[in-house]
Amino acid sequence: MKTLTVKEIKEHLQSVSDEKDPFIEQCKNDERKSVQALVDAWLKKNERLSAMREEWQAMTSFERSLRARGYQYIAGIDEAGRGPLAGPVVAAAVILKEDCEILGLTDSKKLSKQKREDYYSYIMEEAAAVGVGIADAHEIDELNIYEASKAAMLKAVQALDVAPDYLLIDAMSLAVDTEQSSIIKGDAKSASIAAGACIAKVTRDRLMDEYAEKYPLYGFEKHKGYGTKEHLNALAKYGPSPIHRRSFAPVKAHE
């Protein structure tokens, strides 16, 4: 082992994926402290990866069970933006490929903005199909937020390039003929729903950033339309913008 430099060992470890690889045992027996530090770091990283793979197995249990029953195109559906005082509610439907592995994907609210952006790019590129549906503030005021969320979800399903044969929906049911399951807190239990939640969240955040440029008085780029103190103060000072939800009490109070 000592014929290899520390740099060479570091490079070789990057190609090792199994803790039972003889090279790992050789590293453990190397007396150099720098090599011990490298192997300790590799073992910790491998442990994290193993845990993430176990989590992925749990997150895909619904999908695997459905595929075993003969379903092929399983769409996970979720929305973002039910709570804000301004902007649309955005839904996304995602059909993941059977062999995909998106380690670390979970409830989008638990992910950093950068992680969401990274997953968004990967899902958009690697998913079998992605559909997005939007219900704007006017539609929300006409229907109510619950029905508008369902309308956005229906639009997302209709926007898929591949017709799904099963729907996994976060805490909702849709009036369609396609077989479906409603899963409470589905974005923490189903990979397909988590993928849909991520696409919906990133899409909506980007829309709110665009609205921030169009209506700069409200700080939409910071709070994305949620009722923060800054947002409520701007509402009181300037009144509602064209994208505010006038059926929501805090907005109605300032018309």
Swiss-Prot record:
Manganese or magnesium. Binds 1 divalent metal ion per monomer in the absence of substrate. May bind a second metal ion after substrate binding. Belongs to the RNase HII family. NCBIfam families: PRK00015.1-1 (NF000594), PRK00015.1-3 (NF000595). The lineage of its organism: Bacteria, Bacillati, Bacillota, Bacilli, Bacillales. Its cofactor is Mn(2+); Mg(2+). Residues 72-255 form the RNase H type-2 domain. A divalent metal cation binds at D78, E79, D170. Endonuclease that specifically degrades the RNA of RNA-DNA hybrids. This is Ribonuclease HII. Gene3D superfamilies: Ribonuclease H-like superfamily/Ribonuclease H. Its EC number is 3.1.26.4. It holds the Pfam family RNase_HII. Transmembrane segments: none annotated. HAMAP family: RNase_HII_B (MF_00052_B). Its main location: cytoplasm. It is an enzyme of class 3 (hydrolase). GO terms for cellular component: cytoplasm; ribonuclease H2 complex. GO terms for molecular function: manganese ion binding; RNA binding; RNA-DNA hybrid ribonuclease activity. It is found in: Cytoplasm. It comes from Bacillus licheniformis (strain ATCC 14580 / DSM 13 / JCM 2505 / CCUG 7422 / NBRC 12200 / NCIMB 9375 / NCTC 10341 / NRRL NRS-1264 / Gibson 46). PANTHER family: RIBONUCLEASE H2 SUBUNIT A, RIBONUCLEASE HII. GO terms for biological process: DNA replication, removal of RNA primer; mismatch repair. Keywords: Cytoplasm, Endonuclease, Hydrolase, Manganese, Metal-binding, Nuclease. It catalyses: Endonucleolytic cleavage to 5'-phosphomonoester.
